[in-house]
Amino acid sequence: MRTFNRRAVLGGASALALTASFAAAAPRPAAAPKLPARGNVVIRNAYVMTMDAAGDLADGDVHVRDGAIVSVGQKLAAPGASVIDGRGMIVMPGLVETHWHMWNTLLRGMSAAKPDNGYFRTSAGLGRVFEPGDMYQGTRLAAAEALHSGITFVHDWCHNIRGPEFARQDLRALKESGLRARFSYGPAQGHDLKQTIDLADLEKLKSEWAQHGNDGLITLGMAWRGHGGNQPANAVPENVWRAEYDAAQRLGLPISVHSSGSKSAVGQIGGLDKAGMIRNAQIIHAVYATPEEIAAMKAAGSTVSLAPTSELRIGFGIPPTLSFLDAGIPVGLSVDTVTLVGNADMFAIMKTIQGLENGRAENEYRITARRVVELATIEGARSMGIDNKVGSLKPGKRADLIMIDTRAANLGVFGDPAVMLVTAVQPANVDTVMVDGRILKRNGKLTAMNVAQIAREAANANLAVRKRANWW
């Protein structure tokens, strides 16, 4: 039977005090893996889903040069371009993920079905003994899975920043991967709710962002606690959440907040709205948003990130997806945490959203597969404020795209491509992934990440974390 050392695990204040020694334990950055060069490439004779007003193209071509989409059409002239054979492939925008605690991918599947090792207790108990190198290992494993799964943008909602080096190691993993990302700076597991996050370090990080932003691929935001996230509505004192909010505003950082995600958090969105603090904010979960709160979100320009697989798994409830969409609120889809849901399969998340809404409506056609694919691409990009760059295949946008091989055993026939994506496609069907014009997966294999090494080092780090916590 697993036991844990309460002194080691529950000593949150003591753990935070050990930040200096943790920093010493961070791995020395080796030479960063070299990302593939952006080139001049044309994909020919594929089924192209632009997710744009141009619609779909059978036997279509996509021409990419220097990281940008040059043209989309048929029989394109592409002088000097390398050719990728698109026959049997669906070419579509890369998947946009809008909220993921990437660090705790190191704890994959460790949330069990008993109160002593459920998700919150597991992530808090083990997160408190993380060292900076563990942040790198967890986020690097998550990034590899993202690329394997066709995800080209991630929102890394980092809520285990126990000191400056924890944030830098997490960012190091993102930068090495080549993913497009937002890194949202948050608290630590076990952080005193009466204390602000390290606002001085957040300001310092912003001032040195040129070191971390990977030439604009990665941007900075705040993982704001608001009134307390999934805790009771007033868990975080007003002076704390106001100070954090004001810092984000002063630094010009986008805000993202867990709110009204569980029955214990009912009313949080309304409370934040009364304080004038949901304007242009991303609201996560919002399972218990009321009609009045949804109207307030629309008026304030808020967006929402939904994580149906985790919301069901943990028992929060069913998100009111169509209520948000009917109100005109941009909606994105979220992995949330693989500690709880096991993997980062955005195709399964799409299937779950469609099943929940059609089941609730008792109507097979209430939300179409095409609409759900929009949530994972252009709508998700809109919810993150990056739809001017990615989310659809349109000349001038950045070249974030994926290719799905339809000739696999779980596919094999070609009907409605959107229905196929939502109901049948799996991450293993993703043949090629391109981010900003760089090919990061080709012929089913990652091109810039050594998966065997990443998995081996993550497994070793997981065992070390469990040993420090006496968590078996």
Spans of features found by a protein language model:
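His/Asp/Glu-enriched, well-ordered alpha-helical/loop segment
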Residues: K274-N280, L322-A408, T423-Q426
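Active-site gating loops and adjacent loop-to-helix segments of metal-dependent hydrolytic enzymes
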Residues: L106-Q137, Q231, K263-N280, A300-T303, ...
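Metal-coordinating catalytic core of metallo-dependent amide/deamination hydrolases
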Residues: A32-P33, E165-Y288, E292
